[in-house]
């Protein structure tokens, strides 16, 4: 029987490794998360215990195992149109404001996870184009994630009924999806065409991504240390065009982390504009 217990020291060593690789800070009480996320890899890589797996990951003995472990710890499924208001603000304020500049609008979804956020953006753009023909110039979305398996899932754009039921209205399901068989639905090509998925570790340089007018970095900073949060936010400020906007998660704040943005109160919600 495979042992799935780990010692406090093994947990601390793995936490240091994970923070060094992708900035995620687990804290003192997330052993259960490590066990649940990494235990399947013990069998997959034919190891005798979770302790052996953690040792091989931390020492770098097996590169494929390292990649799989980071992938498992950074994989999160999210909701369609999460919190609702960011997409209302995108449709009613940000897109019309950016359209006045008469140049292509570039948007970055900085942690695309299983694809719901960037595809929700794309649906919002298509809805604005339908309601206000001719308003928008070309709009493109760059969606990034550290997880290779999540990016593969995003590009496929196929979701089961459970995933589709998390925040997606029946009307949007009808308009923007097509049947994929086996009770699953696939994002239509006109939605997919707006989104380009790319790998990106938020601890590394963003310069190759180019400049953006709008950045969604929602429910990501909560996993990082204060120093890492500041580094990410200052890099994102440098990645925005003049007058660009940053949208964070509903419970996230810039307080004490960067002075590059000014708060903008919307109805509803709060967003941040580059100074």
Curated annotation (Swiss-Prot):
Sequence ranges assigned to domain CheR-type methyltransferase in this UniProt record: 1-275
Keywords annotated in UniProt: Methyltransferase, S-adenosyl-L-methionine, Transferase
Gene3D superfamilies according to UniProt: Chemotaxis receptor methyltransferase CheR, N-terminal domain, Vaccinia Virus protein VP39
GO function terms (MF aspect): protein methyltransferase activity; protein-glutamate O-methyltransferase activity
InterPro entries associated with the record: Bact_Chemotaxis_MeTrfase (IPR050903), CheR_C (IPR022642), CheR_MeTrfase (IPR000780), CheR_N (IPR022641), CheR_N_sf (IPR036804), SAM-dependent_MTases_sf (IPR029063)
E.C. designation(s): 2.1.1.80
Enzyme superclass (EC): transferase
An individual GO BP term: methylation
Reactions accelerated catalytically: L-glutamyl-[protein] + S-adenosyl-L-methionine = [protein]-L-glutamate 5-O-methyl ester + S-adenosyl-L-homocysteine
Keyword presence, Cytoplasm: no
Binding site for S-adenosyl-L-methionine: 76, 78, 82, 117, 145, 201-202, 218-219
PANTHER family: CHEMOTAXIS PROTEIN METHYLTRANSFERASE (PTHR24422), CHEMOTAXIS PROTEIN METHYLTRANSFERASE 1 (PTHR24422:SF21)
Described function: Methylation of the membrane-bound methyl-accepting chemotaxis proteins (MCP) to form gamma-glutamyl methyl ester residues in MCP.
Name the UniProt record assigns to this protein: Chemotaxis protein methyltransferase 1
């Amino acid at each position: 029987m495979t042992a799935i217990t780990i010692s406090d020291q093994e947990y601390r060593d793995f936490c240091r490794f994970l923070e060094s690789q992708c900035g995620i800070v687990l804290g003192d009480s997330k052993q259960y998360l490590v066990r649940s996320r990494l235990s399947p890899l013990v069998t997959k890589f034919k190891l005798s215990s979770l302790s052996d797996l953690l040792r091989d990951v931390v020492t770098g003995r097996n590169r494929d195992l390292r990649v799989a472990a980071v992938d498992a710890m950074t994989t999160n499924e999210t909701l369609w149109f999460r919190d609702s208001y960011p997409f209302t603000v995108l449709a009613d304020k940000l897109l019309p404001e950016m359209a006045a500049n008469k140049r292509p609008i570039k948007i970055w979804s900085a942690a695309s996870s299983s694809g719901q956020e960037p595809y929700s953006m794309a649906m919002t753009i298509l809805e604005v184009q339908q309601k206000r023909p001719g308003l928008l110039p070309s709009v493109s979305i760059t969606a990034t994630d550290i997880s290779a398996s999540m990016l593969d899932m995003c590009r496929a754009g196929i979701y089961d009924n459970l995933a589709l039921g998390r925040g997606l209205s029946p009307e949007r399901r009808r308009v923007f999806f097509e049947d994929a068989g086996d009770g699953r639905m696939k994002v239509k090509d006109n939605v997919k065409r707006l989104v380009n998925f790319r790998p990106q570790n938020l601890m590394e340089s963003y310069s190759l991504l180019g400049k953006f007018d709008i950045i969604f970095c929602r429910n990501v900073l909560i996993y990082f240390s204060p120093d890492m949060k500041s580094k990410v936010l200052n890099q994102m400020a440098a990645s925005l065009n003049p007058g660009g906007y940053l949208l964070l998660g509903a419970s996230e704040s810039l307080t004490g982390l960067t002075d590059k943005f000014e708060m903008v109160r919307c109805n509803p919600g709060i967003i941040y504009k580059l100074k």
